[in-house]
Amino acid sequence: MNELVIFNKIKWLISYSDKYVFNSFTKVHINLKIRYQDRLYFLLENCIRSNTNIGNIRVKYQKEMLIDISLIDYYIGEAYDKKIIKKNRFSSVINSLNEIRKMTYSWSIINEEKK
């Protein structure tokens, strides 16, 4: 599992968020933090699930990954708009999310071609 590049990127994003993003949230915005944090872990879970399954089940979890990425993108955008996180941290998260999104799209296209 550690050889999967997407998995490693997601682990890096969770680690980065633990160090730099989660600490920025105040008690007023704790709900946004919890949703962001949950979606990160759902993304990791769906990556593992899609890697261990095959066929239509794999496609389902890959689509779930894309949904998780979109929601994480929305939540981090809200945090930036509310000035909870700094621009450089926002950029790091968005760049990482874009890499994960592109890899997930490519992975799903490869699976579609194998059918």
Which residue stretches match the model-derived regions?
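Amphipathic alpha-helical assembly/interaction segments
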Residues: M1-K115
